[in-house]
Amino acid sequence: MNEVENNNHSFPREDIPTEDEIEEEANSRQGILRYFRVARAEYTKFALLGLMFGIIGFIYSFMRILKDMFVMVRQEPTTILFIKIFYILPVSMALVFLIQYMLGTKTVSRIFSIFCGGFASLFFLCGAVFLIEEQVSPSKFLFRDMFIDGKMSSRSLNVFKSMFLTLNEPLATIVFISAEMWGSLVLSYLFLSFLNESCTIRQFSRFIPPLIIITNVSLFLSATVAGAFFKLREKLAFQQNQVLLSGIFIFQGFLVVLVIFLKIYLERVTMKRPLFIVSSGSRRKKAKANVSFSEGLEIMSQSKLLLAMSLIVLFFNISYNMVESTFKVGVKVAAEYFNEEKGKYSGKFNRIDQYMTSVVVICLNLSPFSSYVETRGFLLVGLITPIVTLMAIVLFLGSALYNTSMEESGLGIVNGLFPGGKPLYVLENYFGVIFMSLLKITKYSAFDICKEKLGMRINPTYRARFKSVYDGIFGKLGKSIGSIYGLLMFEALDTEDLRKATPITAGIIFIFIVMWVKAIIYLSRSYESAVQHNRDVDIDMTEKAKKSLETPEEPKVVD
C-alpha cells in the first residue's frame, strides 16, 4: 500500500484542502453526527473501511460462538487450555515471525491481502470437509473410551485427556484455532495496522470511535444470527447440520473475498487522489528502509514505554483467560446440574455476552465517553479496565468460591468457609457473563482506545513492528500463560474443575492488577507529554538508538 503521504506531485495543491480545513468540517457536526466526525471528502474512504471492519468483526463474533459450541459439544472446556498452549501459541508465534519477515519486502497492505486470501481458502476448505467429515475423521470414541470408568484417570495420565480430545475432533480444533487467529491477526493487528498507515494521527482519532460502533453492530447482528442458527440446528438431523455448517463456512469465505475486493477498490480508486494536505502536526516521518525484527526487539529491550505497553497487554490477557476458563467450566457444571444440552446452554450465555457487549459499546461511543482520553485524560480511561478486573475477582470469583464450598469440591479451607446451603449456579453464570462482557466492553472502549492512541504517537518507522510485538506476541503469550496456569491447576489439584483453584486465581490476578496500574500511570505521563508538545511519544530509550529514528521529509498530502 502507498503511504498516506504520497502522490503530492500528481495533483495541483489548489484543488486539495488542508488537513485543518477537513478537521474543521468534521468537528462541526451537530447532534448524533458529532460522534461520526467524518468530512464530506472522507465519506467514501470511511464507508469502505467501515464495511471492511464490520465484515471482519461479524466473522470473528460468529466464529467465537461456533468455537465454543464445538468445544462444549465435541470436546471438553479443559481442551481450550491445551489448544491455546500447544496449538495457538506456536501457530501465532510462527505467523507473527512470518509477518515480520514479510515486512522486510512487502507492505502492510500486501500482507493484509495475503492473510485474507489464506483465511478465505481455509474457510472454503472447512466448508468442503464438513460434507465428508464422517468419511475422513476418526471415530468420535477413539480416545474417549480410554477415560471412561476411571481408565487412565490417574493423576499422571489424566492430563493427556485434553490432548487426545483435540486429536479425536480435529475439525473442532481447527475451527477454534482459525477463530483465534482471525481475531488476533486480522481483526486486532493487520486491519488496525492497515488503518494506521491509511490515516494521519488526527484522522485516525476521528475514525476509531465510529468504526468501533460499526463492529459492535456486527457483534449484535452476529448474536441475532447465532440465535436463529441454534433454533434451526435443533430441527435438523446430523447430516443436515453438516450441510448447514458447510454453508456457513463457505459463506464466510465469500465474505473474506469481499473484504479483499473492498480493499482493492479503496486503494486503487478512492485513495488514488489525495484527500488533503497534511499539517505539520500530523506529518509522518519517513520510514527507514530496512528495519529487521531483531533490531526492533533490541530497541524495545531498551524502551521502558514499549515494555510497559507489552506488560499491560500481557496482564489483561492472562487475567481475562483465567476468568474465562473459570466461567466456562462453571457453565458446563451448571448445564449438567440443570440437565441441559451443553452447546445450547453455552450458546445462550454467548449470545447474552454479545448482545450486552455490542449495545453498551455502541452507547458509549455515541456518548461523551468516546472522547474521554482527550477530555478527561489517558490515566482515567486507562484505569477503567483494571478496576473492572478487580470487581470480577470480588463478585464472579467470589460466587465460584461459594459454589465450590457448597459442593465441598474446593480447597480444604474453602469447604468450611460458608454455612450450609445450595450452590447458586445461576448467580455464578450470570456474574460470569456480565464480567466477561464488561471486560470486553472496557477493552474495546477504554483499553484498546488508549493503546491505539498511544501507538499512533510512536514513530512510524517502528510502529508496525512494535505493534506486532506487544499486540501479537504478548497478546498470545498472555493467553497461553493463562492456559498453562489452568493445566497446572488441572494436574496439581487432580481435577477438571478449575473453580477449585479460585483462591489462587484471585490472588494472582490481584498481583497483576497492582503492576498493571503502575504501568498505566507511567504510560499516561508519556502520552500526555507527547500530546502537550505535539510530537512523537518518547519511547524512553538510549540516545544512540534514538538517532536512527529521525529522517526529515517535505510536506506531503494524504490519500
UniProtKB/Swiss-Prot annotation:
Pfam family, one: TLC
Stretches with biased composition (Polar residues): 1-10
Keywords, ordered alphabetically: ATP-binding, Cell membrane, Glycoprotein, Membrane, Nucleotide-binding, Transmembrane, Transmembrane helix, Transport
Methyltransferase listed as a keyword: no
Sites where a glycan is attached: 8, 196, 290, 403
Molecular function GO labels: ATP binding; ATP:ADP antiporter activity
Annotated InterPro entries: ADP_ATP_car_bac_type
Membrane topology value: Multi-pass membrane protein
Localization in the cell: Cell membrane
Region described as Disordered: 1-22
Transmembrane regions: 46-66, 79-99, 111-131, 174-194, 210-230, 242-262, 305-325, 354-373, 377-397, 425-447, 473-493, 503-523
Cellular component GO terms held in the UniProt record: plasma membrane
Family statement drawn from the similarity comment of this UniProt entry: Belongs to the ADP/ATP translocase tlc family.
Function: ATP transporter involved in the uptake of ATP from the host cell cytoplasm. Provides the microsporidian cell with host ATP in exchange for ADP. This is an obligate exchange system. This energy acquiring activity is an important component of microsporidian parasitism.
PANTHER family for the chain: ADP,ATP CARRIER PROTEIN 1, PTHR31187
Protein name: ADP,ATP carrier protein 1
